[in-house]
Amino acid sequence: WGEAFTYEEIKYEIETKKPAIFAIVHAETSSGVLQPLDGIGDICRKNNCLFLVDAVTSLGALELLIDEWKIDLAYSCSQKGLSCPPGLSPFTMNKRAEEKLSSRKTKVPNWYLDLSLLNKYWGSDRVYHHTAPVNMNFAIREGLRLIANEGLENVWNRHNTNAKKLWNGLESLGMELHVSEDYRLPTLTTVKIPPAVDGDGFRNH
């Protein structure tokens, strides 16, 4: 806990288990780990496996190259890197994932989570699925406008710069950070509780 999976570990698991879909968290909230994703998409393509990424804590704040890294499906939220109120879950899937979805032999048992229905709702069929939260659409538009005005790479750099200042400050106080710098999230910092501090008492307080 507190370490990223290596490329070799992921490659071995995909090649031996042969999953239909490989899912991984890009930015792990509980541990503060940033998982490298480059190269995983190639392994998935070679093994006829879809590549799904949980980008809840990374979208908008960290480099996330959906097409370049050959990510087939990804989802996130509105309230973290996009700086909006909670309530929306941005989602993307490519043609490869759509083809897999449309070739299902069994019906999705859950109506609300049936992506084929969502596809028809957002696509040209316009089949009703749910009432969209219009106020949230305005909110996410504003969040995206602010990111676009600053520049996406500038946002990434700002998070990195501020994180390093925080890390240096914590270490100057004698605190030990939980994750090695190579795999440390710039958007979420985890700190080890010093031996002299009662961890349970601190959390309860």
Regions found by a protein language model. Name each.
Residues 73, 88-92, 188-190:
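Conserved hydrophobic/aromatic beta-strand scaffold that supports enzyme active sites
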Residues 176-205:
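Conserved PLP-binding catalytic core of the aspartate aminotransferase-like
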Residues 79-168, 172:
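Active-site C-terminal subdomain of aminotransferase-like
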Residues 67-79:
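Conserved active-site segment immediately N-terminal to the catalytic lysine
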Residues 59-69:
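Glycine-rich, charge-decorated loop segments at or immediately adjacent to ligand/cofactor-binding or catalytic sites
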Residues 2-58, 73, 81:
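Active-site phosphate-binding strand-loop segment of PLP-dependent enzymes
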